[in-house]
């Protein structure tokens, strides 16, 4: 299942969070339709901006849209004209006040959506698909937080008559591990032979810190209070069976003979006077 399903949807509530955060009762379908329209509006008008992610939050009378982009200057525009235009379009679409936040992506080589978009742009410019895939993998693996990457291209690769899929992988990409931090991106390249789909999976290590992970990492019985042993000597055990020294006949006989031998050792020998200290 982990090989086929969308990694973000597979890990929702475990290691990933929802991209749209709001509550609705009867307006649920309308809000879903609005979210799709918002994302489509931002995707069609800002292809060159390198948008990695769009997050949407709603309140009763306001909509907050966070745009994560690798080129914030294109989204903002000269003196903020482009940002004002986007905000006006969103307010016209949602009929509510829109708060637009433009956030810069620090490491675009480690974001799966931006890597997929970069490979797709090279395919549209007639670059060989294998060369584009290997170049993207090499640039991503240079980042310190990237542990593994997988890039897949599907379609009429190289103008072939029959479509096929090819992928390259470097490092570890555990798609079925729920605690794994997997970033996933999808983009379509428009070529003269048709569309070529590009998928990218980037593994950035495991996420440990949730309640389930902490409970699993803690040793068994670690939360129990430690019982203190009472002061005094602990009875010695004899043999491998774990019995005490007086629980068997041989042990009892040995303990009875021990005081007699001690008394004989302390008594003076015959014919020798006792010496006392003055």
From Swiss-Prot:
HAMAP family named in the record: Ribosomal_uS3_B
Biased composition (Low complexity): 238-278
KH type-2 domain residues: 38-106
Alphabetized UniProt keyword annotations: Ribonucleoprotein, Ribosomal protein, RNA-binding, rRNA-binding
High-level lineage: Bacteria, Bacillati, Actinomycetota, Actinomycetes, Mycobacteriales
Molecular functions (GO terms): mRNA binding; rRNA binding; structural constituent of ribosome
PROSITE patterns in the cross-refs: KH_TYPE_2 (PS50823), RIBOSOMAL_S3 (PS00548)
Family that this chain belongs to: Belongs to the universal ribosomal protein uS3 family.
GO CC terms, sorted: cytosolic small ribosomal subunit
The keyword Ubl conjugation appears for this protein: no
Name of the featured protein: Small ribosomal subunit protein uS3
UniProt xrefs under Pfam families: KH_2, Ribosomal_S3_C
Quaternary structure annotation from Swiss-Prot or TrEMBL: Part of the 30S ribosomal subunit. Forms a tight complex with proteins S10 and S14.
Organism the protein comes from: Mycolicibacterium gilvum (strain PYR-GCK) (Mycobacterium gilvum (strain PYR-GCK))
Region of interest (Disordered), residue spans: 215-278
GO biological process: translation
Task performed by this protein: Binds the lower part of the 30S subunit head. Binds mRNA in the 70S ribosome, positioning it for translation.
InterPro entries named in the record: KH_dom, KH_dom-like_a/b, KH_dom_type_2, KH_sf_prok-type, Ribosomal_S3_C_sf, Ribosomal_uS3_bac-typ, Ribosomal_uS3_C, Ribosomal_uS3_CS
